[in-house]
A protein has these predicted regions:
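Active-site/ligand-binding-proximal alpha/beta "capping" segment
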Residues: 157, 163-203, 209-214
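N-terminal positively charged helical leader segments and presequences
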Residues: 1-72, 123
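Structural motif
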Residues: 6, 18, 40, 62-64, ...
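RNA substrate-binding interface of SAM-dependent RNA methyltransferases
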Residues: 70-165
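Structured adenosyl-cofactor binding patch, chiefly the S-adenosyl-L-methionine
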Residues: 198-241
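Gly/Ser/Thr-rich beta-alpha loop segments that engage phosphate groups in nucleotides
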Residues: 40, 91, 193-197, 218, ...
Length: 241
């Protein structure tokens, strides 16, 4: 039977290995999809590739599966980070979901002077990332970190990484120009509703780790800028090329 569901699990996956599914997954399989024992599912954990598995238990007491064969080997993750200022409503959730679909490895919220949303539900955001990975077919789930100050990624002690700063004001190069030297590690930085303050822009532009980039002739909403920037990076430098 062709698998109808793809699930992210935290446990190791190997031939004939049993896998216990969490209570949410068990409920979904049993009561929403109504899958019987023996039904096929696909499992992945971000380390061991993707596996075809058969359900050996599904019901009120939970769900378990056993791995039958590997369907895809694990592939390297594009070393791309997203640094973004959280936004109001459910748009932060959407940013996490779409960034996952667009292939980022790590999602790092940053707090700017104009950031309105300063407390995040990390459990929910990590769940959104896992669900997006299940749906889009990727073999990994990006890490979602707690929010840090805007200037934390510029700390000399931090891992060196080229940061493309989506600058809505002032002179800035294209994404293709910024990535012409093919850096090993890249991050996209997008701002809050209302944009960065002049002081923040000045500090960012002064850093040797930062290259200001423009995302076209129109002013974009904070979430739209994130999607546009990641798309340009992936098509120019990332795993779309």
């Amino acid at each position: 039977m062709k698998p109808s569901q793809r699930l992210y699990v935290a446990t190791a996956l190997d031939q004939d290995g049993p896998v216990a599914l969490d209570t949410g997954q068990a409920h979904y399989l049993a009561h929403v999809l109504r899958l019987p024992v023996g039904a096929a599912v696909l499992l992945f954990n971000g380390r061991d590739g993707e596996w075809l598995a058969h359900l050996t238990q599904v019901g009120k007491k939970g769900a378990e599966a056993v791995c039958v064969e590997q369907t895809r080997a694990q592939t390297p993750v594009c070393d791309l980070d997203l640094l973004f200022a959280p936004v109001k409503g459910d748009r932060t959730d959407t940013i996490v979901e779409k960034a996952t679909e667009l292939g980022v490895a790590r999602i790092r919220p940053v707090l700017t002077e104009r950031t309105i949303v300063r407390k995040l539900n990390l459990e929910r955001l990590r769940s959104r990332a896992a669900e997006a990975s299940e749906q889009c077919g990727t073999l990994f789930v990006p890490e979602v970190f707690d929010a840090v100050s805007l200037m934390s990624p510029l700390d000399p002690k931090a891992e060196p990484r080229l940061i493309l700063f989506a600058d809505e004001a002032g002179d800035a190069m294209s994404v293709a120009e910024a990535l012409a030297d093919k850096p090993a590690r890249v991050a996209l930085l997008t701002g809050p509703e209302g944009g960065f303050t002049p002081a923040e822009r000045e500090k960012l532009r002064a850093s040797p780790l930062v290259r200001p980039v423009n995302l076209g002739p129109r002013i974009l909403r904070a979430d739209t800028a994130t999607f546009a920037g990641l798309t340009l990076i992936q098509s120019t430098w990332g795993d779309w090329t």
